[in-house]
Curated annotation (Swiss-Prot):
GO terms for cellular component: mitochondrial large ribosomal subunit. The keyword ATP-binding does not apply. Belongs to the universal ribosomal protein uL14 family. It is found in: Mitochondrion. The keyword Ribonucleoprotein applies. CDD domains: Ribosomal_uL14. Keywords: Mitochondrion, Ribonucleoprotein, Ribosomal protein. GO terms for biological process: translation. Its main location: mitochondrion. It comes from the Eukaryota. This is Large ribosomal subunit protein uL14m. InterPro entries: Ribosomal_uL14, Ribosomal_uL14_bac-type, Ribosomal_uL14_sf. It comes from Dictyostelium discoideum (Social amoeba).
Length: 129
């Protein structure tokens, strides 16, 4: 069950590892359940460790960003009758203009993300389930 206050893993190379949902977007009530493809506002809780300092991280700890949910522990039922779920809740971080912050996605992305209209998120992912 994904609600306000849920923790997520970040599935891109923006530099963040763990985030927490602080607000829902697009007319959803704060108490409503969120699904794959919904947009949320998150705060960054944990960052990846920099080794050598050769590259600059795109976000900092305690930054507030937009995100879209790309996979969830909660089972998702499709029209064909197939039920899919993941081992963890995952998001992709977005800018204010709804463009992805990272340039590469790690892990799988559920096909339900396509209904959000964010086609660039789907195009940079390797695995779509």
């Amino acid at each position: 069950m994904i609600i306000k206050g849920s923790n997520f893993s970040v599935m891109d190379n923006s530099g963040a590892r763990k985030v927490q949902c602080i607000q829902t977007l697009e007319g959803k009530k704060p108490t409503s359940l969120l699904r794959v493809g919904d947009k949320i506002v998150v705060v960054i809780k944990k960052m990846e460790k920099r080794k050598g300092g050769k590259y600059k991280l795109k976000v900092k700890k305690s930054d507030v960003c937009y995100a879209v949910i790309v996979k969830s522990k909660q089972p998702v039922r499709r029209k064909s009758g197939i039920i899919v779920n993941a081992g963890e809740n995952g998001v992709i971080l977005l800018t204010k203009t709804k463009e992805p912050i990272g340039t590469r996605l790690t892990g799988v992305v559920f096909k339900e993300v396509q209904r959000t209209g964010l086609l660039k998120n789907v195009s940079i992912s390797k695995y779509i389930i």
